[in-house]
C-alpha cells in the first residue's frame, strides 16, 4: 500500500527548467520532491549560470546556516570550496558527497565555472540565517 502523505514524482532531464534562487550566479532546478513529500524534503540541482565564467567568488552573506534537520550535497561536476565552523576548509570535487549536521555555520568561498551539485534538505521550506 502506498503512503497517501507522499506523491509519486518523476522529473525528466529533457524537461528541466532552471530558475534563479538564493545565489545570483547560480540557477536552480527543482526536482519536485518538495511538492511530492508535502514539504518534508527538498531536492534540487544547482549550477553556475552560463554567463558566469572562470572561478566564481560566491556572493554570500558571509557565514550563515540553514535552519534544517538534514542537508546533503553531492557534486555532479566541477568543484566547490566550503568552510564549516569547527571542521575546517574543504574542496569538494565531482563525485564527492558531504552531509552537514543540522544548522552548521558555513560559507561557500569559490567554485569552478562548471560547478553543478545535487542538494537535498529537510524541511523543504526553511530559513537561511546570517551568523557572525
Describe the function of each predicted region:
Residues 2-14, 19, 107-132:
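Double-stranded beta-helix
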Residues 17-64, 69:
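A short glycine-rich, His/Asp/Glu-containing loop-to-beta-strand
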Residues 37, 81, 126-127:
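Flexible, glycine-rich phosphate/dinucleotide-binding loops
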Residues 45-49, 65-82, 120-123:
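Short, conserved beta-strand element in jelly-roll/cupin
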Residues 57-59, 101-104:
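Short acidic (Asp/Glu) patches
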Amino acid at each position: 500500500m502506498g503512503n497517501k502523505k507522499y506523491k509519486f514524482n518523476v522529473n525528466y532531464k529533457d524537461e528541466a527548467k532552471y530558475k534563479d534562487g538564493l545565489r545570483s550566479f547560480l540557477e536552480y532546478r527543482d526536482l519536485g520532491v518538495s511538492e511530492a513529500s508535502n514539504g518534508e524534503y527538498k531536492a534540487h540541482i544547482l549550477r553556475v549560470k552560463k554567463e558566469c565564467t572562470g572561478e566564481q567568488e560566491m556572493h554570500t552573506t558571509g557565514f550563515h546556516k540553514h535552519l534544517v534537520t538534514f542537508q546533503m550535497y553531492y557534486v555532479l561536476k566541477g568543484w566547490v570550496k566550503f568552510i564549516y565552523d569547527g571542521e575546517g576548509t574543504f574542496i569538494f570535487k565531482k563525485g564527492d558527497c558531504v552531509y552537514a549536521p543540522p544548522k552548521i555555520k558555513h560559507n561557500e568561498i569559490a567554485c569552478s565555472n562548471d560547478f553543478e551539485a545535487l542538494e537535498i534538505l529537510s524541511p523543504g521550506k526553511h530559513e537561511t540565517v546570517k551568523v557572525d
